[in-house]
Amino acid sequence: MGEVAGGAAPGPPRSGLVSIIIGAEDEDFENELEANSEDQNSQFQSLEQVKRRPAHLMALLQHVALQFEPGPLLCCLHADMLSSLGPKEAKKAFLDFYHSFLEKTAVLRVPVPPSVAFELDRTRPDLISEDVQRRFIQEVVQSQQAAVSRQLEDFRSKRLMGMTPWEQELSLLEPWIGKDRGNYEARERHVAERLLSHLEETQHTISTDEEKSAAVVTAISLYMRHLGVRTKSGDKKSGRNFFRKKVMGNRRSDEPPKTKKGLSSILDPARWNRGEPSAPDCRHLKVEADAEKPGPADRKGGLGMSSRDRTVGTPGQDNPGVSLHPLSTDSVDSREPGVDTPQEPGDTPPQGPTSLEPLAPPESTEDNGETESPEPGDDGEPGRSGLELEPEEPPGWRELVPPDTLLSLPKSQVKRQEVISELLVTEAAHVRMLRVLHDLFYQPMADGGFFPLDELQNIFPSLDELIEVHSLFLDRLMKRRQESGYLIEEIGDVLLARFDGAEGSWFQKISSRFCSRQSFALEQLKAKQRKEPRFCAFVQEAESRPRCRRLQLKDMIPTEMQRLTKYPLLLQSIGQNTEESTERGKVELAAECCREILHHVNQAVRDMEDLLRLKDYQRRLDLTHLRQSSDPMLSEFKNLDITKKKLVHEGPLTWRVTKDKAIEVHVLLLDDLLLLLQRQDERLLLKSHSRTLTPTPDGKTMLRPVLRLTSAMTREVATDHKAFYVIFTWDQEAQIYELVAQTSSERKNWCNLITETAGSLKVPAPASRLKPRPSPSSIREPLLSSSENGTGGAEMAPADARTERLLNDLLPFCRPGPEGQLAATALQKVLSLKQILLSTEEDSGAGPPRDGDGVPGGRAPGPVHTQEIEENLLSLEVAIRQLEELEEEFCRLRPLLSQLGGTLSPNLAAPERSAQTGLS
């Protein structure tokens, strides 16, 4: 078995480790075995020791891949690789780490701590901050340490018995240990390279699952590249789903030279995330041969750089014949993969390829300036060639502008034209991508009957409208460019026509509809591929078409969202390099409209994700306990439908019912409710709990799991920096819930959100009450025509008009439900506190309290009494707060009643006196 797996028969341990065969009858067997064990496994005592030795690590990885689940070990190694990246690269690499090891459908998924799994389920990984990402990685790695330690221990024990691979290769490194470090490291890498090459050739022996075998080999190859080992599979398509790190000095020998296409390091596979192949597309290689000649000289000249050197696009997409010039660092620096995302909260694009849009589409080239040759594989789609970029579009504005004019342009104008050129070319690429999505996927899915038409339209909503809108915008840009002779002076009106006014509102509506359903679409398509082999084969066949440019369907769906994030940056850069004030104002206004559209779309995406999450919770919600309960306060929640609510926040908390009883709950903060859900398998239970309290008549009180926020308030627990109280009033009865968060910052966040949500449900402020409202008569009486009413509104007597106005002002104070007994309730709480304090005095056996004693008897109350005192004080605080609010309302009500008294008859003035008496 070892010979097949390792490529060399393990055989007996090498000379120098066990010099002779020792029989079990030898009396020194155990002592010599222990000595040899320590010497032989000195390189494998811990993962920290072995992970910097490529050859030894290859032996360990080979053993683990054949004997164990390799996910934990590879997860720890890739986490170590991620920690060596810079902040920007690490944030982007976390997405690939998530999709490789943490995602539920990942081939190499590892056990994830519940706290991390919950956060990842409720938050898109690309929206997680860098600090939280690092914390998640640390927690995941810590949870894998036990499994990795067991694998190391097994390897060490098997190595003593000569059952581990690559022993002969490792023995060649022994003489060099402790001598020349540089020479030793070079030999380590050389041996590791040969071992890795053999592993790639025999990867089918790792697992019967070909996908898993390929994923394991790819993960190992990527980490070997991180250690400086040259690999053969570093550029293969199987390398997707793993982040890449550029290894200087070891990469170029195995890769085709990047200057072959005139592209800068922005298209280096190390700069891109999963799902994006790095090998160049050779379909238009011949066309680009002439365009690439001045590339090196242009790169030296800065502004003379070839446009393809700085194009932001997707690896694997060619850019024939389109000259796209670089942007300065103060405009859109396309050298950084993450610049295409506006630096605004919530504007991070959803998971998917890092690039915001593909490269420029095929257009007219130097070899053929009038017609565009169809792409290979598009023969079966007649009439579609015109859907690509119009053949009249020239290869680049620099090549058509007279040299004298080009030299006379100021630097800012050159930058401006470059950004406008990028806007045009990338818009053409986006239109091409949308049409590919429509022609190769949407329409064949409809024709093939894979989905019902209404369901398919829900997966690709408003796709036709988006193609029409973007095509119209592209036509306007092309027309303006041709009219201006490739030096566009005014573009603000074209931008405003697209992003402002009615056109902007329509664009916002259809883009919100499409983007908000992309998560739903990806889940539906993934589920369909798992269940139906015919659909899976159809998708794979469509993705193999040349028009897809080796992009997968899951990479194409997020392109609209990614395109929206590009607009604000491009328009902002155009505005910064526009000197004429009127034109600059138009461009900046268009950029602001783009930001508003993007903000609206992001909010629509979040709302849709919240709705899908609520639907999942509603499906798992178990209302059995509520329906069986006789509590009248819970009767209205027996058919609770949370999908009609708005999700504000959610998370795990600990509910301290009593001092000795704590329950782990998942809390949902909705727009008007707080739900305390208990997990039981896949179900979510809403269950009440009882708590014994001395002051209550029956000795018990029920704590309900559904809480209305109209009377909610929060207080932090002074003795626990993670705990807080949520206080509610149920029918003049205050209930106190003690909840514990995982951190103090989470406690603060929960308190703020509950307070803000409850505050939005309170009675409107006095200023808002002065807004015009329907008159009381219009609420109580059906609408009457002027003929039925006798006179029109203009003929109303002045006194009646004044009465109507005063009644309109009084309307906000008309609320259902009794407000009395507040003072009596507060007094009852005071008496309860007094009773507790007196009972504390009796228990202590002391005499009557003296003046100045803080506590009766001079002693502090016990824990039970302390909790009762605290709860009664909080209840008293609620009652006092309600009394203060009532007093404020009465102060505002009194002058209105006085004014109304002058216009009403004496028999109508009586309610004023009764109201004053009742409120006082």
UniProtKB/Swiss-Prot annotation:
PROSITE patterns: DH_2, PH_DOMAIN. Residues 281-311 have a biased composition (Basic and acidic residues). Gene3D superfamilies: Dbl homology (DH) domain (1.20.900.10), Pleckstrin-homology domain (PH domain)/Phosphotyrosine-binding domain (PTB) (2.30.29.30), Regulator of G-protein Signalling 4, domain 2 (1.10.167.10). Residues 646-759 form the PH domain. InterPro entries: DBL_dom_sf, DH_dom, p115RhoGEF_RGS, PH-like_dom_sf, PH_16, PH_domain, RGS-like_dom, RGS_sf. Its main location: cytoplasm. GO terms for molecular function: G protein-coupled receptor binding; GTPase activator activity; guanyl-nucleotide exchange factor activity. Keywords: Coiled coil, Cytoplasm, GTPase activation, Guanine-nucleotide releasing factor, Membrane, Phosphoprotein. The modification Phosphothreonine is found at T694. It is found in: Cytoplasm; Membrane. GO terms for cellular component: cytosol; plasma membrane. Residues 231-404, 764-797, 840-864 are annotated as: Disordered. Ubiquitously expressed. Residues 39-230 form the RGSL domain. Phosphorylated by PKCA. Angiotensin-2 induced Tyr-737 phosphorylation is mediated by JAK2. Isoform 5 is phosphorylated at 'Ser-390'. The modification Phosphoserine is found at S373, S408, S905. It holds the Pfam family PH_16. It comes from the Eukaryota. The modification Phosphotyrosine is found at Y737. The keyword Cytoplasm applies. GO terms for biological process: Rho-activating G protein-coupled receptor signaling pathway. Disruption phenotype: Mice have reduced response to angiotensin-2 and lowered RhoA signaling pathway. PANTHER family: RHO GUANINE NUCLEOTIDE EXCHANGE FACTOR 1, RHO GUANINE NUCLEOTIDE EXCHANGE FACTOR 2, ISOFORM D. The RGSL domain, also known as rgRGS domain, is necessary but not sufficient for full GAP activity. This is Rho guanine nucleotide exchange factor 1. It comes from Mus musculus.
